[in-house]
């Protein structure tokens, strides 16, 4: 007997696969079980019972067609009927006596009967009648294999198992329930929220007002920090949901590339249809070959004395009924196959739209999917559309951003953020956030913050809670794409004073920054397109009505004409061009109110003529250019308010005599050039307070230096000075004197007359000793005296002790 458990391995599969089995596949599966039971039952009967029973035919026949078994049965029936008629006479007064029946003797023993039965079973019985139950089992197993092949094939089973694993986790995830419940709650409150005032909006956790940057976001950004603890996810659940988002992204990217699942399902369905047609045809034709009486001709006269037999196929009647039942089940199975083909071709299964889910849930950014991803979702819908609805939550970027926000709030509580507060060089209390996946809502609980720096923060969204930062004046966006909501923009527009934006792509510049009407300083750092028409951000400067400082560190070939839009109030304009040659500077002429102008690393060879028309200019900085001559300096006399001139880090070989025309100069920086001689006319600029000639090739300092009675800073380090004029020490207000890395052999004792001296640099010279009079520099401390230790030790003990005490 064949146990049914032996066939378990053919039908066994993971219970989770049921989500990918539509109703027709389930029906087909149960039909195959029924057909399998028919085959197993037939095989059991075939094995356990006699297959055929034969009796010899006393009429000899050479071929099977001559054997008259059927006529024999008819004759037997007729004779029986005639005998019955003769034995049952009509009722008369008298009746004949009963006739005695006598049987035929065949003179065969049991072994001969067994031999004949086996011979006739093999030679006379039709093959369909012999192997019918086995064929049913084989065909049914093939149907089962075809129906489940894509669950076992390596190329498809891995994707299916991965999908089912993710689908189950998404269905059971607490984040799915939370997201759907929040959306359903928000949709009922959306209309009242739009009518609330800004103050009301800021106090409610479920508020969001769309802005150009966020108007298309389907899920309002709730303030996660203020949600009730009953609905809040713990940290572990948040991390699990975050991992699910990553898995869904990777799975979608992997599966949407091809259509292997769809093709495999299509092929196995077509194969089942073809096999169904073949099996139905040959079974319908051959089912009539199952006979109860089977004539048999076997040449066994020498062994048995007979060569023709009439055999009884004992299971013919039952097999014929099983065959008809099998054909009925097979017909229903075929209908499911044809319906599957109809379903496959009726609609585009390689495209799946979440339109109904978007309308029902309110999550408007759920993307439509294609190829194998779409196909498996169509199959899941046939099982239960709720799976797709809950799975769609993990396809939404807005849902992911909200989860990220929740995890951020767990990771960065307000107390932890306060520990990161630092003071900037300007004295502001700054919070620096680096490489975070978003902006925690808890940031807006740090009310004492004055400056917020966001560096490489992905998708930072500034909510209306920013109004809590009443002391916020400065915002830095370093390689950070930031979006603001309408209520946030209303607050920043009136309160933000300083903004720094560093970018790698012009698209990273948020356009909302050009609507900050209270902004006073704007600093842009990044590469702009050489074609200014492709720089739309620079076309919006006209909205910055309060802008006073504009800094651009980029690679411009010409000054944007739109800079003139802020000419009426711009006071400081800086360009750091990173070595790119600045060719066109005509736009400078319109900056009539500019007081400070910096053109750094612009590859300028001469002082631009456009500068000379800036009558309000006070500070001119041309650092790190390629200036060889400054003969045009005479034209700077038109800039009557010019007080600071920085021409440092260039290749200037000499100072022209007409520098004396710049009577108002208070600071002149010519360090890091190639100047050989200092003209005496320079010292006619008697208002100089800061003179830096360090790291040139100067060999002599003119005695006219003593004319500069207001001089407080003198830098002569890195030159070839061998001696200092006595007149230098007439500059009684000198506070900083840098003479390091020269060739000085001694220092005049008159250095003691510099009572205001705070810093004296002498390191790197050829001195053997220091004058004791250096101790008369009452303001000079040991920290301000930069000399070698051995040289310091040449001072008298009392002088050294004085410095040490200080």
UniProtKB/Swiss-Prot annotation:
Residues bearing carbohydrate: 57, 80, 312
Record topological domains on the Extracellular side: 44-130, 297-323
Annotated TM spans: 23-43, 131-151, 276-296, 324-344
BP term (GO), one: cellular response to osmotic stress
Disulfide pairings: 54-311
Annotated compartments: Cell membrane; Endoplasmic reticulum membrane; Lysosome membrane
Main localization of the protein described in the UniProt heading: membrane
One Pfam family linked to the record: LRR_8
Cytoplasmic compartment segments: 1-22, 152-275, 345-806
Basic and acidic residues biased stretches: 188-207
Region described as Disordered: spans on this chain: 75-104, 182-217
Keyword Membrane: yes
Membrane protein topology class: Multi-pass membrane protein
Gene3D superfamilies (alphabetical): Ribonuclease Inhibitor
Start-end of each LRR repeat: 569-589, 593-614, 616-637, 641-662, 664-685, 687-708, 710-731, 733-754, 756-777
Quaternary organization: Heterohexamer; oligomerizes with other LRRC8 proteins (lrrc8a, lrrc8c, lrrc8d and/or lrrc8b) to form a heterohexamer. Detected in a channel complex that contains lrrc8a, lrrc8c and lrrc8e. In vivo, the subunit composition may depend primarily on expression levels, and heterooligomeric channels containing various proportions of the different LRRC8 proteins may coexist.
Family: Belongs to the LRRC8 family.
Function, as annotated: Non-essential component of the volume-regulated anion channel (VRAC, also named VSOAC channel), an anion channel required to maintain a constant cell volume in response to extracellular or intracellular osmotic changes. The VRAC channel conducts iodide better than chloride and can also conduct organic osmolytes like taurine. Mediates efflux of amino acids, such as aspartate, in response to osmotic stress. The VRAC channel also mediates transport of immunoreactive cyclic dinucleotide GMP-AMP (2'-3'-cGAMP), an immune messenger produced in response to DNA virus in the cytosol.
Full protein name: Volume-regulated anion channel subunit LRRC8E
